């Protein structure tokens, strides 16, 4: 079994299983031996020909699929078309469903930090919440860490933020970037002043612990 080094991408990897591919629940078609996350993205709550009810129905079925490792992207985005109250409702639905199905939650967040922290306090999840594509400053990273979040870094981020994240709360991802995950590991290792192989092994253990152990 391959443990993916890349926890969030929108592209199928050359070797199935090397990355967790993010999919919409209504269009999910898995590759043999691939790994996936599925969720209702805040951008597409209302801007889709598929109804929200149908998306929820598909999602509830897919979270029991053996190749689906995580819920997400779920999130809050003040630049999205859907109203913030509706986004909060859909996010809370997905967060509670992640708890019911024993899945970590991969989070898309834009300009809604306070709202997210309030929801975490309300829901009090047991399963990890992971901020994907974190680009904030170190002070924001510290706040997330105090509230128990994990952080995933992509191609662009604040170097000091990466440096302060404890090794057991760290992930790397390509998201929509064409930069290889190997290059991202090499850069992160240089920034954190740790050998690239050691960093990969640390993140591999994190992935195994968070995404595979039930």
Model regions and ranges:
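Mid-domain alpha/beta scaffold segments of enzyme catalytic cores
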Residues: 1-214
